[in-house]
């Protein structure tokens, strides 16, 4: 997701995306613990996306 797309989301959309991405991250970590996933960089990318969404949510909340 690009930065411009993140900035265009509403506060409610940001909250929903954060919850969805956290669930996705949990599933990825669990799948990687059982057997290595094909692209382990997905975990890092998802974690960074959550951070970007959280940062934008904080900026919009102020």
Curated annotation (Swiss-Prot):
Keywords: Ribonucleoprotein, Ribosomal protein
Entries under Gene3D superfamilies matching the protein: 1.10.287.310
Protein's name in the database: Large ribosomal subunit protein uL29
GO biological process, one term: translation
GO cellular component, one term: ribosome
Family the entry assigns: Belongs to the universal ribosomal protein uL29 family.
GO molecular function: structural constituent of ribosome
Gene for this chain: rpmC
Naturally occurring in which organism (per UniProt): Cytophaga hutchinsonii (strain ATCC 33406 / DSM 1761 / CIP 103989 / NBRC 15051 / NCIMB 9469 / D465)
Any Pfam family matching the protein: Ribosomal_L29
Keyword Ribonucleoprotein included in the entry's annotation: yes
